[in-house]
């Protein structure tokens, strides 16, 4: 009997520098969490209750917590077919983050902190009815003025 359509653990591409070079690494987006997609939540809940000791589902207020529609839509926009948030290419233009390409496009209001040296953006997102902090990879090759950015865009 199939109770789950898909079981996955979302990840993100990050960069790590070792041996003098930057390397892409895949990291867990929500360490310790596994997501289960199912059309029959009641049947899934019953099945999971019988797996005592094997799995501890997220329970808030005594029950299993499904992801809300808007939370699910946000995650689907960020994740690719492999359930991974890929690297974004961004610029800082006159002190503001401008996303050139990648999953952060249109989501700069969620960015709380940028670490250019580690090539990481810390985001605040809504998940399980609460604000959660996540990290995603990004590349910021330069800080530019508006004129420099427009000149660069015109050249490409």
Predicted regions and their residues:
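Acidic-enriched and Gly/Ser
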Residues: 1-96, 113, 118, 122-156
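Short, charged beta-turn/beta-strand-edge "cap" motif at the junction between a beta-strand
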Residues: 101-105
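Short beta-strand-centered aromatic/proline hotspots
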Residues: 106-114
